[in-house]
């Protein structure tokens, strides 16, 4: 990939609480919109931006846009192995919460908060292959892969 790979402890994308148009997490980038815009201004200088994000405990694929709706890049949020994810916290409300995030946040293209796992990333000149791998248990050294979701991200191209 010809561009910039950025690591972030927290989601950079703008997340709103459904219907309220208020920041989801003011202790993350949501609480620092001016600083996020300064970061985006620098990232706009790069041909293609791919952000790897952790500490959300769920899987995400997000398009990043600045305040003027200019495409900045794609953000990949990796799932947790042992930390609580959406289903651990909200149980049967998980599907509704995930659907709400996608509906209310145009930049969120996909999310998964039901399974534990990890993310594999293969970078080539033409694309980034993102594979979210989920396991049936994290309480044993013996586990099975129960699902994997693959996505191809093209340089400087929003996820549709």
Language-model regions, residue ranges each:
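Single conserved hydrophobic/aromatic residue that forms the stacking wall/gate
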Residues: 1-14
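Short Pro/Gly-enriched beta-strand edge/turn motifs at strand-loop
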Residues: 3, 98-107
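Beta-sheet entry/capping signal
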Residues: 8, 48-50, 73-75, 118-120, ...
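Short, well-ordered beta-to-alpha junction loops that form the rim of enzyme active sites
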Residues: 8-9, 54-56, 133-135
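A solvent-exposed, charged loop/short amphipathic helix patch at secondary-structure junctions
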Residues: 13-27
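Short catalytic/ligand-binding loop motif for oxyanion handling, primarily in non-cytosolic enzymes
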Residues: 13-17, 58-62, 84-85, 129-131, ...
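Conserved beta-sheet core of the metallophosphoesterase superfamily
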Residues: 26, 30-101
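A short C-terminal boundary segment appended to hydrolase-like catalytic domains
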Residues: 106-160
């Amino acid at each position: 990939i010809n561009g910039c790979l950025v690591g972030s402890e927290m989601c950079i994308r703008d997340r709103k609480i459904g219907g309220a148009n208020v920041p989801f997490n003011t202790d993350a980038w949501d609480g620092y919109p001016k600083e996020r815009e300064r970061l985006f201004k620098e990232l706009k200088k790069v041909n293609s931006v791919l952000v790897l994000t952790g500490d959300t405990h769920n899987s995400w694929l997000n398009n990043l846009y600045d305040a003027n709706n200019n495409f900045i890049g794609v953000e990949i949020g990796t799932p947790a192995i042992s930390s609580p994810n959406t289903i651990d916290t909200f149980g049967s409300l998980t599907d509704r919460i995930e659907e709400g995030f996608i509906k209310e946040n145009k930049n969120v293209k996909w999310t998964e908060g039901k399974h534990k796992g990890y993310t594999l990333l293969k970078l080539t000149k033409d694309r980034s292959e993102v594979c979210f791998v989920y396991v049936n248990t994290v309480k044993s050294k013996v586990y099975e892969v129960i699902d994997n979701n693959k996505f191809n991200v093209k340089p400087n191209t929003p996820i549709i």
